[in-house]
Amino acid sequence: MEEALKTSHRAIRSFVLRQGRITAAQTRAVAEYLPARQIDAHAEWRDPWNNQRPLMLEIGFGNGEHLAAIAAQRPTWGCIGIEVHTPGVGSLLLQLVEAGTDNVRIVHDDAVTWLKTLPDAILRCIIIQFPDPWPKKRQQKRRLIQPDFAAVLCRLLQPGGELQLATDWADYAGQMLTVLNATPGLQNADADNGYVFRPDNRILTRFERRGQRLGHAVYDLCYRRIP
């Protein structure tokens, strides 16, 4: 996913754009199926479902496994996914076509820049799973969850809407808690302002199951938008 985090001097990206290997099937899927399912990040916002559905957003959907599953579980919702890496977009499209799922739209562009252009309080749920942890100390300014970005996420949520996050890096989880607990308008779903159990709607992906086999702990966070 492509994020630009502003500092006082210049924009700092929270990603490195590595396209990686893309299969022939993914390439065809992007060419054939993306145009009908794409949201133009450079155009004025228009709700793809004409304000008739609650909207869920997943930022950085990776290979699309989680987004495809949750969209199938919530057929009456409008599900939007943001991902900068083309192989992941192709992978998601293949899953959607195979399942016949038609309630997903895709932003294949810079997430932070696009989110800043959206009107207030349009989203019922925002999901961010396993963002790049940037583990080295000199890299941590690239982490996605920073105060300015947290304020944007809060602004986009409807009152009562949820922000759900997960990471398997303890240090990053602690930073998320610090930043989000201090964000006006967000209330931690945990009474002690700590971590929560995995939400029922969060599907275990192959990535997470592999981490569990390796003994990686996963930290879940959940926040609600308050007036």
Curated annotation (Swiss-Prot):
Regions that span the bilayer? none
Q: Name one Pfam family in it.
A: Methyltransf_4
Q: Where does S-adenosyl-L-methionine bind?
A: 58, 83, 110, 132
Entry protein name: tRNA (guanine-N(7)-)-methyltransferase
Gene that specifies this protein: trmB
For molecular function, the Gene Ontology terms on record are: tRNA (guanine(46)-N7)-methyltransferase activity
Where are the catalytic residues? 132
- Which top-level group of life is the source organism from? Bacteria
Q: In which pathway does it act?
A: tRNA modification; N(7)-methylguanine-tRNA biosynthesis
